[in-house]
Amino acid sequence: MNKKILFLGVGGIGVSALAIAAKRLGAHVAGYDSAANKLTAKLEALGIVIFTSPSGVDVANFDIVVYSSAILSSHPLLSQARSLGIQCLQRAMFLAVLMKDFSYSLAITGTHGKTTTSSVLATLLCQLDKHSSFVVGGVVKYADSNIQVNGTDKLVIEADESDASFLFLSPQVVIITNIDLDHMATYNNSYQTLLENFTDFVSKESVKSIYLCVDDQGCRDLLAKYNQSDKNVTSYGFSINADVQIYDYHIIDEITHFKIRYKGDDLSFKLQLPGKYNVQNATACIIACLDLGFKYEDIRNALIKVTGVARRFDLYTKVISGHQVTVIDDYGHHPVEVANSISAVRDRYPNKKIIHVFQPHRYTRNRDLIKDWPKALSLADQLILLPTYSAGEQIIKGAESQDIAKGLSGYLLADGFDHAIYFLEKLANENTVILIQGAGDVTNLVEMLSE
């Protein structure tokens, strides 16, 4: 990749990964972001020049400009590049270009769990095949990075359905974790349009193998809609109708145990990640690795080393009002993700009271899923609800934090992190476990608990 490439919005997790990948594949790389952060510092340590002011960038020196979804079309650097006739590519479009440097690519998509599933597959393949690489939307704990380039053989990528940009990609293998109602503005608020986009993705000529979770209604709807016979389509899940069935799920000493029935063989596995949803995610990766020809024992040994991705069920021990308390930091921000996480906490800590501290993310999501929130938020023993993280949106009347808990009793409404800590200091003891959850800045609350 002998090109000069400027990455705009390089302080974000997705674009930073592409910048590193491009550099390791031989490109001359520079980046721009309006503010320096840990990711830009990492890029600078790798020898990538980072600009924080548009005035310092000579756009004419670059062959390609790659930009994140956070970069507006009116941004001066993007506008200048277009006026100069420089090729400008949205993040997913450049990922499609990057994929061409690899012999074989595996894409993970779905409304929930794609980052975790990508991290599981990346961790497995990096142990099973030293020439495997990955570019995912979170920090893979096994590698302490969101990117690894170990040659140009196999590439694991996270394919984003939220903006339909996965349609730019042409992988050989597709894993679909689930299909649910989120980011529906992308699909004109039409479930059928959403399904059609997934159908278009798996129908690409490059795709040879497709793995879908048959426990999920959306995946079942896709299976009913998709009727091409020229691809290897495998369903997996706890359902007796799955091609690869999961069974004997249980937890011993905080380790998840389960078995799968694969082509007539009963195979047992252990996993550090909690919850049935993570067993489903891991099973998709196991099947893909088995179908690639890797040995069961090698996969089994590699799986127990999988530790997931940052901010997905991260475990901490905090001292709160003199009590040692388990605190879990999690990125979940959709009713399905909330319900799955609370179920996983319940499975792992069956004798403890669950205190759920939740920060809703986006008023539009609150509004669009208003009927689904109360059931999910009722599953913990105690709910502490924070103000909604706006992510730049204007307040929508009837879609604020108290509105998504309509009909619930006994929950506590905190006006900020300090107020939430006040509640936790009154409620927490050795018999409680605290789940702090949301896609905004609520992770900062975890650090505040140690102060």
Curated annotation (Swiss-Prot):
Cross-referenced Gene3D superfamilies: Mur ligase, C-terminal domain, Mur-like, catalytic domain, NAD(P)-binding Rossmann-like Domain
Primary localisation category: cytoplasm
Keyword Lipid metabolism: no
Listed GO biological process terms: cell division; cell wall organization; peptidoglycan biosynthetic process; regulation of cell shape
PANTHER family the record matches: UDP-N-ACETYLMURAMATE--L-ALANINE LIGASE, UDP-N-ACETYLMURAMATE--L-ALANINE LIGASE-RELATED
HAMAP family: MurC
UniProt family annotation: Belongs to the MurCDEF family.
Name the UniProt record assigns to this protein: UDP-N-acetylmuramate--L-alanine ligase
Organism: Francisella tularensis subsp. novicida (strain U112)
Gene this protein is translated from: murC
